[in-house]
Structures are given as structure tokens and as C-alpha cells.
Amino acid sequence: MAAQQRDCGGAAQLAGPAAEADPLGRFTCPVCLEVYEKPVQVPCGHVFCSACLQECLKPKKPVCGVCRSALAPGVRAVELERQIESTETSCHGCRKNFFLSKIRSHVATCSKYQNYIMEGVKATIKDASLQPRNVPNRYTFPCPYCPEKNFDQEGLVEHCKLFHSTDTKSVVCPICASMPWGDPNYRSANFREHIQRRHRFSYDTFVDYDVDEEDMMNQVLQRSIIDQ
């Protein structure tokens, strides 16, 4: 999927097939890559989750991660919040429709969605067993800003805090990209804040990639449910 670009109204602009493939992209926060939670529109026109914006405002001279203009506290995006409350999407498991504001709580308890996740993990494992050389490295990661590499998750977080605290370039998260559920082409508008919010823990704490297939699937499933 191509990197998202947002207009002054905060809606993601995707052209052609990309727009059709990601019709809900305009409801996605460019920092945490989740559906907006308490969306706030800042003076430059872009929108962030309230909690994500607070993190982005912490530097002495904060900038918008999308357009790099000076960042300041914003106002509640009431219209966008209304759209999140009224826009429907379907559960990949049971295929029932739910409002965006309700889908997370639904999938956490939907047994068919859990089966959908298991089938996806099973397919990933099967493909990896057929092409072992293409299995992504989930233990060490390169810095997306510079040539440094071989960081564990915690090391990558610390490296970016120390050496890239002012770099606002949109980059692909190497941790997300290595996971079965990750999108290797999705660029986070503020990668440093993204990894601090989304990767405070190591996946190895929850998933042992050396255990048998069934145990691994169950561990990944539990992690995905918790993250919803």
C-alpha cells in the first residue's frame, strides 16, 4: 500500500486502486496507525489521536509529522468523530457490519474472527516453511533513518530517541513490517512516536518462534486480540 498523504481536512488522499483497497484510510491516525481515538485537528489541518498529539508535542520545537510545519495544540475534530461513529465496516470473521467505533470491542470476542486470524497465521507459517530463506528477521532490526542495524526492539527505540529525535521523515516501521500482520509499505508519519507507543514490549516476550506451530498460533492470536 502506498504511503498515505493527508489533506488540510485530515483525510488521507489515496489515488486510484489504493483508495479502493483502503477505503477506511482517512480514519487512520498517521502516528499509531489505528482508527482515530478522540481525534484532534491541529492548526496546519492534519489530525491525530489526542494521546498521539500529546506525545508529538513533547519536544521543545514540535513539528507536524505529516507536513513538518510547527505543531501546536488543536481542536476536537467533531465532524470526523461523528463519521467514525456512523461509518460501518465488516468483521473479517463473521462478516457482520459494525461502526468503526465498535469494531475493536467486537473482534476481541468474535470466535470467527479468531479463526480468521489463526488461518492467516497458519498460511504464513506454511509459506515460510516452503520458502525458509524468505522468513523475515524478527529478532534484530535496521534503523529506517540511517545505515545502523542489528538493533533489538528496545535498542531501536533508544537509538531513535538519541540520534533521530528531530527527524520527521515518514518511514516504514521495520518491526511492524517483519510481522505476519504487518504492512511492509505503510509509512508512519512520526516513526519515533510510533515505536514508543506501539513497541514498548518485545514480541519475543509473548511469542516464542521456536515452539511448535499450534502453540505459536495461539500466542500470536492472543497478542492480536489484546492489541485490538
UniProtKB/Swiss-Prot annotation:
Catalytic function, reaction form: S-ubiquitinyl-[E2 ubiquitin-conjugating enzyme]-L-cysteine + [acceptor protein]-L-lysine = [E2 ubiquitin-conjugating enzyme]-L-cysteine + N(6)-ubiquitinyl-[acceptor protein]-L-lysine
Cellular component, GO, one term: cytosol
Keyword terms of this UniProt record: Acetylation, Cytoplasm, Developmental protein, Differentiation, Metal-binding, Nucleus, Spermatogenesis, Transferase, Ubl conjugation, Ubl conjugation pathway, Zinc, Zinc-finger
Keyword Transferase tagged: yes
EC class name: transferase
Gene Ontology biological process terms from the UniProt entry: cell differentiation; protein polyubiquitination; spermatogenesis; ubiquitin-dependent protein catabolic process
GO MF annotation: an example: ubiquitin protein ligase activity
The record's account of how the chain is modified after translation: Autoubiquitinated. Polyubiquitinated in the presence of E2 enzymes UBE2D1, UBE2D2 and UBE2D3, but only monoubiquitinated in the presence of UBE2E1.
Locations listed in the record: Cytoplasm; Nucleus
Pathway, per record: Protein modification; protein ubiquitination
Predominant cellular place of this UniProt entry's protein: cytoplasm
EC number per UniProt: 2.3.2.27
Zn-finger (RING-type) residues: 29-68
Transmembrane parts of this sequence: none
Tissues/organs with expression: Expressed in numerous tissues, including skin, CD4 lymphocytes and dendritic cells. Highest levels in testis.
N6-acetyllysine modifications at: K102, K112
Zn-finger region bounds: C2HC RNF-type: 91-110
Quaternary state and interactors: Interacts with XAF1, the interaction increases XAF1 stability and proapoptotic effects, and may regulate IFN signaling.
Record's function text: E3 ubiquitin-protein ligase that promotes the ubiquitination of various substrates. In turn, participates in the regulation of many biological processes including cell cycle, apoptosis, osteoclastogenesis as well as innate or adaptive immunity. Acts as a negative regulator of NF-kappa-B-dependent transcription by promoting the ubiquitination and stabilization of the NF-kappa-B inhibitor TNFAIP3. May promote the ubiquitination of TRAF6 as well. Also acts as a negative regulator of T-cell activation.
The name this protein goes by in its record: E3 ubiquitin-protein ligase RNF114
Provenance organism: Homo sapiens (Human)
